């Protein structure tokens, strides 16, 4: 089952799209293909690309949609337009474990409510090179609107098959509105205080 395989579900006469967020492979048992515990994410899978331009000192790698689910974000860097080698970058969870070879990215919210991806400086995290292509893959959602969806229909195909039986283990949940500015103002000083240290000042 390919990443981005789509399903639909309806709530109050409104149809929502759900997609898979990873490739899944199984072997048939007695001629039957059965995927278990498949996670579906409400929304549309989107891919956005930036080409690194070292002459643009103000270049930023912004996720264009304010409704992007950053928990689904996958960041890869292609060497160049002629070298299609891909390197996966992971979200930095702290600074102490990073060095100049760490393929890590950082994430911050802009004043427009969109998120910006940025990278290391060859001291803390590996620095990007001119001509690198930054590939941002993520799901754009309808936030909390699809919570409660319980019946799903395959709207694409799986390995060429369209006659698929689906059993729902749990209803859709977890969709939420973005964090409010008031909440950000309250939490940001607390996060800044820790700064990845074991001891904070008081």
Task: Enumerate the predicted regions with their spans.
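Signature of Asx- and small-polar-rich beta-strand/turn repeats characteristic
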Residues: 1-202
């Amino acid at each position: 089952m390919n990443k981005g395989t789509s399903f639909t579900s309806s709530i109050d006469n409104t149809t929502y799209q759900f997609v898979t967020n990873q490739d899944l492979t199984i072997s048939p048992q007695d001629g039957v293909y059965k995927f278990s515990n498949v996670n579906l994410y409400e929304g549309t899978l989107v891919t956005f690309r930036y080409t690194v331009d070292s002459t643009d000192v103000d270049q930023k790698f912004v996720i264009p949609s304010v409704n992007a689910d950053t928990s689904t974000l996958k960041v890869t860097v292609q060497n160049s337009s002629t070298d299609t080698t891909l390197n996966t970058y992971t979200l930095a969870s702290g600074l102490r474990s990073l060095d100049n070879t760490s393929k890590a990215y950082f994430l911050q919210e802009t004043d427009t409510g969109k998120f910006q991806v940025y990278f290391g400086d060859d001291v803390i995290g590996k620095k990007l090179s001119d001509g690198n292509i930054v590939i941002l893959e993520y799901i754009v959602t309808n936030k909390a609107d699809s919570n409660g969806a319980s019946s799903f229909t395959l709207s694409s195909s799986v390995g060429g098959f369209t006659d698929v039986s689906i059993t729902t283990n749990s209803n859709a949940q977890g969709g939420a509105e973005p964090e409010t500015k008031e909440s950000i103002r309250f939490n940001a000083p607390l996060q800044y205080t820790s700064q990845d240290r074991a001891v904070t000042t008081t």
